[in-house]
Regions:
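Eukaryotic short linear interaction motifs
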Residues: 49, 109, 137, 163, ...
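Generic short beta-strand segments
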Residues: 159-160, 230-231, 329-330
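Plant-skewed but cross-kingdom recognition/interaction modules and surfaces
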Residues: 169, 174-285, 305, 338
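Intrinsically disordered, low-complexity repeat segments enriched in small/polar residues
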Residues: 14-17, 243, 326
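Extended repeat-based solenoid scaffolds, especially LRR ectodomains
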Residues: 272-340
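Leucine-rich repeat
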Residues: 2-11, 18, 22-218
Length: 340
């Protein structure tokens, strides 16, 4: 039986498919560098670097991508991770780093981590995301970070005291997210928020105010404020992922008894709270707020009565609301005032 015809047809189809693939690849290779680098920016840093083996055309493209994202995995690969970050920063064009994310264990390598931060700050980074954990020594972030003129978005997530330098001024910062940061005194908190003159969006997630009596949040451009106080809740129910970091600031937990948070929001449009009302919240000059969402977690009966007064105090400072969203837990807490 003659099978040459089907085989020839299959070979032709395979050849044609290969030709089409080569044509598509050439078309991609002929795209301008900025477009290819933009495409690479959607990949993880590791995958973007792996494209360097495709051809000579791709060999150095990754060195100019504007976004770098480093996420450390298991501790047994730490040395490999540290060397990888060092090598990438050494080979990358520093003038093109606009977005830098770092998620890693600190351990005893604060000097390395600070040098990486200084490197991207020096070259005018615009978006900086830091997720730091597992501290085995005290960390003081480099002073240059707190006067970075190019920075527009900053995320700082770490279960550690925030040590501020004498000068704090973010002239371009519009979005600030603080996660599980420990503030050690009134002065440092005031210094940080006053150093953000054009801040528009502020998120404070499970932060601890150690030895802080009053927190004053005042920014003339602030439009959206989100506060979460779930830390004590997650500790109670064993949902905290940062328990290993507690040793770094063991005394900080014991000094946390709540504080008064005063919010001056002349441009504030939206406020959202989620968690346990362990602090007092007061609004001043905040007639611009139109959207408020409150989700309060129920505690014991004595705390619920106190929380009910705090909800009432919070809402009494808001006079121009168009939308108010409250959770079932918030309603239950407020009902304590009616019962008593």
């Amino acid at each position: 039986m003659d099978v040459s015809f089907p085989l020839d047809k299959a070979k032709k189809q395979k050849f044609r498919k290969k030709q089409n693939a080569n044509k598509s690849r050439k078309e991609i290779d002929n795209l301008p560098d900025p477009i290819l680098q933009h495409i690479l920016s959607y990949l993880s840093t590791k995958n973007a670097i792996q494209t360097s083996i495709l051809s000579k055309r791709w060999k150095y493209l990754w060195t100019s991508i504007p976004k770098l994202d480093f996420d450390e995995g298991a501790l047994d690969r730490r040395l490999m991770f540290m060397k990888f970050v060092e090598r990438v920063l050494a080979l990358h064009d520093p003038s093109n780093i606009k977005n830098f994310s770092l998620s890693c264990n600190v351990q005893y390598d604060t000097s390395h981590i600070n040098s990486w931060i200084c490197s991207v700050v020096k070259h005018k980074v615009q978006v900086l995301n830091l997720y730091l954990r597992n501290f085995q020594e005290l960390l003081a972030l480099p002073p240059c970070l707190f006067t970075c003129e190019s920075l527009e978005v900053l995320t700082l997530h770490m279960f550690h005291s925030l040590k501020l330098p004498s000068s704090v001024f973010f002239s371009s910062l519009k979005i600030l997210t603080l996660g599980k940061v420990i503030f050690s005194d009134d002065h440092s908190t005031q210094q940080l928020f006053m150093g953000c003159p054009i801040l528009e969006n502020l998120s404070i997630v499970d932060c601890i105010w150690k030895n802080v009596k009053t927190v004053c949040i005042s920014s003339p451009m602030l439009q959206r404020l989100f506060i979460s106080d779930r830390y004590l809740f997650t500790e109670k129910y064993g949902e905290n992922d940062d328990k290993d970091d507690l040793n770094a600031d063991a005394d900080d937990q014991n000094d946390f008894n709540g504080c008064q948070v005063v919010i001056f929001g002349t441009s504030l449009k939206s406020f959202s709270f989620d968690g346990e009302l362990i602090n007092d919240y007061c609004f001043y000059n905040s007639s611009s707020i139109v959207d408020v969402s409150i989700q309060v977690f129920e505690r014991n009966e004595l705390d619920c009565y106190q929380d009910a007064h705090r909800v009432y105090k919070l809402l009494s400072g808001l006079s121009s609301l168009e939308k108010l969203t409250v959770s079932n837990g918030t309603v239950e807490v407020c009902s304590q005032l009616l019962i008593t």
